[in-house]
């Protein structure tokens, strides 16, 4: 039987690969001390390259049989509501405007910071914040707290 001995469990871009994410997270909760946290990061199904720009090359790149699950902010909240614990869902944008411009131009990745010196860091940061504010960002972060 698992012993509750951990303060924090972290995983990055794992949950979308798990066939039963609710059971997976429940098993992790058993490993946490009271007040412990599970922190995880997953891709957002509302990634702007798909949901805003509809870049065909990105769609072929993004949708993978290796991912039995794709989560939006709402579907992640629905999943976490099944755990009987408190949680937060945070939104983040990992890839910048330059990367999105290269995807639009070339139909493939590889543009991180490519145009930043020609544009500005303020534009890059503003772009990322606008995507986060609209929920059309590329990353979701879950923070689950064991009661």
Task: Say what each PLM segment does.
Residues 1, 58-59, 131-132:
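Short, flexible, glycine/charge-rich loop motifs used to bind or transfer phosphoryl groups or to couple energy/partner
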Residues 1-55, 69-82, 139-146:
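Conserved SAM-binding loop
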Residues 14, 44-47, 61-62, 114-122:
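Short linear motifs at secondary-structure transitions and domain/linker junctions
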Residues 46, 59, 75, 94-97:
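Residue-level detector of flexible, active-site-proximal loop/helix-junction positions
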Residues 51, 63-65, 99:
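Generic structural "secondary-structure junction" signal
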Residues 54-63, 103-111:
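Short glycine/proline- and charge-enriched loop/turn segments
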Residues 57-64, 70, 82, 88-93:
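Soluble, non-transmembrane catalytic domains of enzymes that act on hydrophobic metabolites at membranes
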Residues 89-147:
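A C-terminal cap/extension of S-adenosyl-L-methionine-dependent methyltransferases
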